[in-house]
Regions:
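Thiamine diphosphate
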Residues: 1-136
Length: 137
C-alpha cells in the first residue's frame, strides 16, 4: 500500500480513501465530489490486502514472542497512523477483502465492497447497485 496523493493543504475535515485496481477510478471521482463539500482527501492504493494482512500478522506474532523488545508496527498502521482521520476502503471484491486489514487501522474504518452474487449488468450499473461508485464513496 502506498500514498498515491496527499490531502491538499487547508482547513476543514479530511478523510483517507483506499482503493485498489480498477476501482481507483471511482475513488478519484469521489475525491472531486468530496472537495465540492470542502472535505480534503488522502488517496492510498492497496496493491494486495492479502500481503498487508500477512505482514500485519507477522508483526503481531513477533511482538507476542518478543514482549521485552520494541514492538514492530505493521505497514498499514505506520502509513495510516492517526486515529482521528476516518478511513474508507473501496473494493470491486467482497467487503471481506479490504476488511482483512481492519485490526491495524486506528479509528473509524468503513469498507465498501460488492457483497452478493447473481447480478449481471454493466460495470457502471453494478457499481451503483453495490454503492461503490464515485457518488456513493
Amino acid at each position: 500500500m502506498y500514498l498515491l496523493r496527499g490531502a491538499p493543504k487547508g482547513d476543514g475535515p479530511i478523510v483517507r480513501l483506499i482503493g485498489s485496481g480498477p476501482i481507483m477510478v471511482q475513488v478519484l471521482d469521489a475525491v472531486e465530489k468530496l472537495e465540492a463539500y470542502g472535505i480534503r482527501s488522502e488517496i492510498y492504493s492497496a496493491t494486495s490486502y492479502g500481503e498487508l494482512r500477512r505482514e500485519g500478522l507477522a508483526c503481531d506474532r513477533w511482538n507476542r514472542l518478543h514482549p521485552s523488545k520494541t514492538a514492530k508496527k505493521p505497514w498499514v498502521e505506520q502509513l495510516l497512523g492517526n486515529a482521528e482521520v476516518p478511513v474508507v476502503a473501496v473494493s470491486d471484491n467482497m467487503a471481506a477483502v479490504p476488511d482483512m486489514i481492519r485490526q491495524w487501522v486506528r479509528g473509524h474504518f468503513t469498507v465498501l465492497g460488492t457483497d452478493g452474487f447473481g447480478r449481471s449488468d454493466t460495470r457502471e450499473a453494478l457499481r451503483r447497485f453495490f454503492e461503490i461508485d464515485g457518488k456513493a464513496v
